[in-house]
């Protein structure tokens, strides 16, 4: 029985990064012999086993053959005569097609170490075109490592898009890769890589439509709305925001792509126009409710937060109510954090003060200071309880506004 550490564990060790998960490939064995050795089968589509002691995954060396379009359109062949090199040849990128034997010797038939040192993402072979998920993975690795993409690989990605292969990606897998891409160090690279090969227009047309839409240069020195969206997204990564907040940053200005041409470069009403494309994107990709809801709140109310010092107390109360801020203060904090990224996502404004967060929290604290239970107990006519609670909260917000002013 010969075992090899493969893929990301080898790559990350060579990069000097922490190795979190180790995947193993086994040659010269069968499913029956693996079970006799105490390995527990867990693979549904191909032979994968858990080690009896470490519980790490061990997969029999295998080859694969394309049988239909899309991510699931493959058949696999695993047998004792499948070599390690044959198994590595089916992998996506040279930097992921390396292995180490039990003595720590590197097995590198496709010069992955050389590409790793040069910072290049390069496909292993022509079979790359058979799996559209690989386009998303390349975009994700570009966002993680900042690597460039080999010209031949870029050409293959464009071919896959033109051939319609990406149109067969299942929503769950797109979201899986998108959510990982959003959490990388430079998430904008994920989207620009997809845009450069034409995949963004097929997978996320609502986002792709932002490029080429102008904004007022006095507010947005970057002018282009797509560029602004990427600046905001990268700011959310620098600020260490979570997945829901980063997704909200991506979606916050989707309505600007729908601004009538005669209004440009102004975008009055873009908040309302942004709801439909955001909902469409979320429904199509089956985005989790936490991410969807924060994105919709950000789309609808980011301009309110930017102008919160100017808002009337009754408008502030309505904002807090529609954001469900009294019951969901942590989510409201996420909204505020995304709005700060929006303000900072403009060249020359990265370090600007953003007092709106402190003001919004002051208003929320004022509204929360009202004891709704006491009001309810002291109100004989129970039908007026909501009105009296709102009136008390409005008075508290008015007092806070006077102090802020």
Curated annotation (Swiss-Prot):
Alphabetical GO biological process terms: RNA repair; tRNA 3'-terminal CCA addition
Residue ranges constituting the HD domain according to the UniProt record: 225-326
Chain residues that bind ATP: 8, 11, 91, 137, 140
Free-text comment on the cofactor: Magnesium is required for nucleotidyltransferase activity.
Keywords: ATP-binding, Hydrolase, Magnesium, Metal-binding, Multifunctional enzyme, Nickel, Nucleotide-binding, Nucleotidyltransferase, RNA repair, RNA-binding, Transferase, tRNA processing
Assembly: Monomer. Can also form homodimers and oligomers.
Additional detail: A single active site specifically recognizes both ATP and CTP and is responsible for their addition.
Protein name stated in the entry: Multifunctional CCA protein
Organism whose genome encodes this protein: Laribacter hongkongensis (strain HLHK9)
Chain's gene name: cca
